[in-house]
Structure formats: C-alpha cells, structure tokens
C-alpha cells in the first residue's frame, strides 16, 4: 500500500497583507532609511571621521546582507525563472565579495593599514611626517594633492591628520597606494606663511610597483610599505 505525501502549502502574500505590513512598519522603515540616507550623504573624511566610519560599516554590511537575501530567494523561489535569476545573482554577489577581500588583503600587505578594507575606494593616501606615517582613503585618482598646515594642524585634501607640525616638516614625496601599483607625488610648490603655517602642492610624478627610500636614516623603514601608520 503506497502512501501519498501531502504537498506543503504554498503561502501567497496578498496585496492586503503587504499594505498592512507597510502600515505597521512604515514609521520604523522611514526612520531607518532616513538615518542611512544622512550617513551616506554626509559621511566624508573631511567632515566627520566618526560618521565616515559608520558609513563604511553600512557599506561593508551590504555584501553579506545581499548574499543572504539572494540565497533566501534561491531556497524560496516562486518558480524556475526566479530560481535561475536568484542563483545567478548569488554567484555574482559571492564573486564580487571575494574579489573585494582579495584586493583588500593585497592592499593591506602593501600598506599595513586597516583602511585597506575600506569598501568605498582602493586609493590610500600616505604621507610620512617626522617618522609617523599617516594613511587615509581618497575617492579619486588626483593628479595633484594639496597639503596644508594651519597653526600646526596638518590637513591633506581637507582631511585633518595631526597637530604639532611646521611647514619645514613637509616631505619631498608622498604616495598613493593602490592594489596593483604605487603613485608617487613630488612636492612641486611650497609657500610659507609663518613658522607653523603653510601649504604645498604635490604633483603625480611616477606610477609603478616600486619602493621609496625611508625619510628616517638607518631606520630601514620603507615609505612605500608604510609601517607604523595612523
């Protein structure tokens, strides 16, 4: 005697239930989306480093959340077409996440900075100030970089890095580290306003996978590999 298995019931979300869900969660969803929008809109290193870090965390969480949702769609696909598309989207999301980690690890090996795992950019601006290596992300591949010192406060492209510097502390070179190569910027113009104020313009001079000599005599530190960074 053969027993027939009862098929599992298929739950269909009706329009009325969708409207009810939106009515119940509309306020919370609106607050969450407003928060994310504000963070993405105003999260810049030149404005607030704290807000920028929150923005990076949100962007970083997008990949695992996307992978989870695409896998969920594969498990609960409505039909074969949705299943096929969900599988494709899952594979693409996983591949892109793996590529992100590979590039981030390569950049971390090059720089030694955890800014290498920034999901927004693979360009890390690096400058050696009296033996302290500052590393910060920049969005674009600039042809020139502006370094400003205002009453001892160090700024690069509007990003505050540190204090206690004079215009004489500005190095002759700085770099922008990327996954596959380094961009060297040479100081092309220097204007002294006072002992603790001035600015310099650095112009891109070389691009390649090479090392720069350390500014510290006898330290053995490689400027391009950027250890002891902040």
UniProtKB/Swiss-Prot annotation:
Protein's cellular compartments: Virion membrane; Host Golgi apparatus membrane
Alphabetized GO MF terms: structural constituent of virion
Membrane-topology annotation of the record: Multi-pass membrane protein
CDD domains membership: HCoV-like_M
One Pfam family linked to the record: CoV_M
InterPro entries linked: M_CoV, M_HCoV-like
GO cellular component terms listed in the entry, alphabetical order: host cell Golgi membrane; membrane; viral envelope; virion membrane
Intravirion side: 46-55, 106-228
Chain's role: Component of the viral envelope that plays a central role in virus morphogenesis and assembly via its interactions with other viral proteins.
Name recorded for this polypeptide: Membrane protein
Gene coding for it: M
